[in-house]
């Protein structure tokens, strides 16, 4: 009986203390090459923890897939980048996560590297608010 109570308390602690994979507000920096500066945009993305494990013995017959907190559903929003030249396309479309889950990192749509550029990277010197 004591082990059941201990297990129950551990599960309650984990649910309260450990953030699971969920939507969160972030600020990203976007740039248009034609406009030569960056702007900051508030959007929604997925963040949190997913249960994972790294086995000591690697079984080649069973792939070791690490799960990450990633989007399940996306919507796209478009913003007009101010100050672009008249002939330049001043519209920028960016993803907004609407639902999250723990799953395999899809390198076709996500930067799965350990050290990516980060959401505030700008290749130009000038930032506009």
Swiss-Prot record:
PROSITE patterns for the chain: GLYCO_HORMONE_BETA_1 (PS00261), GLYCO_HORMONE_BETA_2 (PS00689)
Its Gene Ontology molecular function terms? follicle-stimulating hormone activity
**Which compartments is it annotated to reside in?**
Secreted
Which superkingdom?
Eukaryota
Q: Name one GO biological process term.
A: follicle-stimulating hormone signaling pathway
Task: Give the signal sequence positions.
Answer: 1-20
InterPro entries on file: Cystine-knot_cytokine, Glyco_hormone_CN, Gonadotropin_bsu, Gonadotropin_bsu_CS
Keywords associated with the record:
Disulfide bond, Glycoprotein, Hormone, Secreted, Signal
Glycosylation site list: 25, 42
Q: Can you quote a single GO CC term? A: follicle-stimulating hormone complex
- What CDD domains is this protein classified in? GHB_like
Keyword Disulfide bond among UniProt keywords: yes
Family membership, please give it.
Answer: Belongs to the glycoprotein hormones subunit beta family.
Subunit architecture: Heterodimer. The active follitropin is a heterodimer composed of an alpha chain/CGA shared with other hormones and a unique beta chain/FSHB shown here.
Q: What does this protein do?
A: Together with the alpha chain CGA constitutes follitropin, the follicle-stimulating hormone, and provides its biological specificity to the hormone heterodimer. Binds FSHR, a G protein-coupled receptor, on target cells to activate downstream signaling pathways. Follitropin is involved in follicle development and spermatogenesis in reproductive organs.
The entry's protein name is: Follitropin subunit beta
Q: Which species is this record about?
A: Ailuropoda melanoleuca (Giant panda)
Name of encoding gene: FSHB
